[in-house]
Amino acid sequence: MRSKAKGLVRPLITKPVQPLSSHMHLFLLCILFLSALFLTLSEAVCNLQDRESLIWFSGNVSSSVSPLNWNLSIDCCSWEGITCDDSSDSHVTVISLPSRGLSGTLASSVQNIHRLSRLDLSYNRLSGPLPPGFFSTLDQLMILNLSYNSFNGELPLEQAFGNESNRFFSIQTLDLSSNLLEGEILRSSVYLQGTINLISFNVSNNSFTGPIPSFMCRSSPQLSKLDFSYNDFSGHISQELGRCLRLTVLQAGFNNLSGVIPSEIYNLSELEQLFLPANQLTGKIDNNITRLRKLTSLALYSNHLEGEIPMDIGNLSSLRSLQLHINNINGTVPLSLANCTKLVKLNLRVNQLGGGLTELEFSQLQSLKVLDLGNNSFTGALPDKIFSCKSLTAIRFAGNKLTGEISPQVLELESLSFMGLSDNKLTNITGALSILQGCRKLSTLILAKNFYDETVPSKEDFLSPDGFPKLRIFGVGACRLRGEIPAWLINLNKVEVMDLSMNRFVGSIPGWLGTLPDLFYLDLSDNLLTGELPKELFQLRALMSQKITENNYLELPIFLNPNNVTTNQQYNKLYSFPPTIYIRRNNLTGSIPVEVGQLKVLHILELLGNNLSGSIPDELSNLTNLERLDLSNNNLSGSIPWSLTNLNFLSYFNVANNSLEGPIPSEGQFDTFPKANFEGNPLLCGGVLLTSCKPTRAKENDELNRTFLMGIAIGYFLSFVSILVVRAW
C-alpha cells in the first residue's frame, strides 16, 4: 500500500467567473446612483427661496466697477459676498457687498431671506426708499449697514397697534449714516420699541427732523453708541438720554438743538465721547461734567455757551481733545487744565477768555500737539512754558493782546509746523524771522498785524541757505512794514501762498517772484509799489499748469477776508485756496502784459486801483478757469474783447472808471454783471448800460470800404461772365 508523500500540496482548482445577470447590473447601478445622490444631498445647497430672492436682488442693481458675477449654475452659498448657515437646507445668513459701486434700488425680495443676520451694502450708490416693512420683517437681523449710499424718503417704521409693541428684534448694530433719509424718528415705532439688544445706532449725515429719539434709552438698555450728528434735529436734548447708562459715545453735533445740556447727561459714567457742536445750546458748562472721568473727547464748539470753564476740568484726566471754541465763555483758563496730561488737542478760539497764561503749567502737557487760543483777550508775553510742550505741531494765538518778542526757545519745538500769531502787538520782526527760519518743519507762518511801522530786513543773505526749508504759507499782511519787497524771499522755494498786502512796500515788483516754482497765491495789494507789471510774474509755473500735491490738510484752518466781505473765508486745505494774483491799489503804470494769457490755472486776477493803461489784452480769454477779473479804477482804453464771453466760469467782472469805449459784450456771463461794474467809461455802450451804440467814424469808413470792394468784385464777376457768353457764341 502506498503511503502519501509528505508535503504534497493539492492543486487549487478555480471555477470560471460567471457573468453578472441583468438584474445584478441594475442593482449595482441603483447603488451607485443612490450613493451619488446621497453625496450630492450631503453638500450645502442654499435654500430655494433665498436663492430666488438673491437673484431678484441682483436684478435690481448694477455696477461698472465691480459687477456681481453670480454664476447661476452653482450653489448660491458659494456666491461672492454670500454666507449660509450649517442647517440642512442652508439658509442665507450674510449678504456682505460693501464698496462694490452698486447702483439701483434695494429689492423687497431681501425681506424674504428670513434668517438673514447681517446685511452690509455700505459705500455703494444705491438709491430710492427702503422697502415697506423692511425693518420689522428681518427680525433675525443683527447687523445692518447701509451707510454711504443715496437712500431717500422716510424710514419704513410701522407704528405700534395692540400687542405689536411686544415684538422683539435681534438687531445690535444699525448704521444708516450718510444717506438722504428724512422725516421724524417716532417714539411709537414697532421696531424701535423692540430693539432690546441694540448696541450702536447711527443715523448721522441725513436730513432727519423733529426731536432726537431719546426714548431709545428706555427700549434699548444696551446702547453704547448714539450718533445723530449732521441732521436737522431740533428741540431740547431730552433728560431721557440719562437712562443710557452704558453709553460710551453720544454725538448730536451740527443740528438745530437748543436749550441747556441736561444734568442727567453727567450721570453717564461710561461716556467717552460727548460731541454736541454747531447747535444753539445755551447756558453754562456745569461743573458736574467733571464726573465723566472716562471722557476722552469733549466737543461743544459753535454754540452759545457762556460762563467759565469748570475749575475742576483737570479731573477729566483721560481727556485727549477739548474743543470749546466759538462760544461766549469768559474768565481765565483754569490752572487745573494742566492735570489733563493726555490732552492732544486744545481749542478755545473765539471766546471771551482773558488774563495771562504764564501761570498755566504747559510743561505737564507733553502730549499736546494742537493749541488754538486765538481771538480772545489774553495779555502779556507769549508764555515760555509753551515751548516745553515738545509734541506741539500747531500753535495759534492770533487776535489777542500779546506783547513782546518771539523767544529763541521756540526752536525747542522741533515738530512745529503751524504758527499763527497775527493781530497782536509783537515787536522786532527782524529778530522773529531770524529765529523762526530755524524751525525746520515750519510750513505755515502767519505774522500779520504785528510789528507796526518796522523796516523789514531786505538783503538776500538775511535768510540762511537752509532757512525756512519747508515753508509753504507765509503771511505778513497789514503790518505797515517799510522798505522794498525783501530779496531773501527768492529763497523760499517751497512757498505756495504769500501775503504781503497792506504794508508800505515801495519800488517795483521784482521779476524774480515769477521764478518761485510753487507759488500760486500772491497778494501785493495796498502797498506803494510803482513801475510796470513784470512779464516774469505771469510765468509762475504753478499758475500755468495744475500741480498735484500731498500733505494738503492744514493743522488748523486759515481765515482770510480778501474782498472785505462780511465773513471770513475758512480754508482747511492748502489747495482750497483759489489760484490768485491780487495787486490792488498800488501805483503801477504801463500795460497788462500779454503773457497773462499763460496762467491757465488762475481763478482770480484783481489789478484795480492802479494807473494801468493800454487795452485789455485779448489773451485773457485763455484763462478758462477765471472766476474773478477786476480791472476797475485804471486808465485802460480800447474795447472790451468779445472773446471774454468764452470765460464760462467768470462770475465777477469789473472795469468801472477806465476809458473804455464801444459795445459791452452781451453774450455768456456778461448779461449778468451789474451796471455799476461798467460805469465811469463814457464811451461804453450797449449791454447792461441799455444805451444804443452809434457807429463811429472808423466804423462808417469800414462800411464804405466794404461797399466799394464789394462793387469792384461784382463788376469783375459780371465782366468775366460776359466774356464767357461771347466766346460761347
From Swiss-Prot:
Q: Where are the LRR repeats?
A: 89-113, 114-137, 139-163, 168-193, 195-219, 220-244, 245-268, 269-292, 293-316, 317-340, 342-364, 365-389, 391-413, 414-437, 439-464, 468-492, 493-515, 516-540, 542-560, 561-584, 599-623, 624-647, 649-672
In its UniProt entry, what is this protein called?
Receptor-like protein 2
Q: What is the lineage of its organism?
A: Eukaryota, Viridiplantae, Streptophyta, Embryophyta, Tracheophyta
**Region: N-cap, residue numbers:** 45-82
Task: List the PROSITE patterns.
Answer: LRR
Gene Ontology cellular-component annotations: plasma membrane
Annotated spans, C-cap/acidic domain = 690-707
Q: Which residues lie on this side of the membrane: Cytoplasmic?
A: 729
Q: Which residues are glycosylated?
A: 60, 71, 145, 163, 202, 205, 256, 267, 288, 315, 330, 339, 375, 428, 564, 587, 611, 622, 635, 657, 705
Assigned keywords, A-Z: Cell membrane, Glycoprotein, Leucine-rich repeat, Membrane, Repeat, Signal, Transmembrane, Transmembrane helix
Q: Which family does it belong to?
A: Belongs to the RLP family.
Q: Which residues form the signal peptide?
A: 1-44
Question: Where does the UniProt annotation locate this protein?
Answer: Cell membrane
What topology does the record note for this protein and the membrane? Answer: Single-pass type I membrane protein
Provide an example Pfam family for this protein: LRR_1
Any one of the GO BP annotations: meristem maintenance
Q: Where are the transmembrane segments?
A: 708-728
Segments on the Extracellular face: 45-707
Please explain the role this protein plays, according to its UniProt record. Answer: Involved in the perception of CLV3 and CLV3-like peptides, that act as extracellular signals regulating meristems maintenance.
Question: Please, which domain of life does this record's source organism belong to?
Answer: Eukaryota
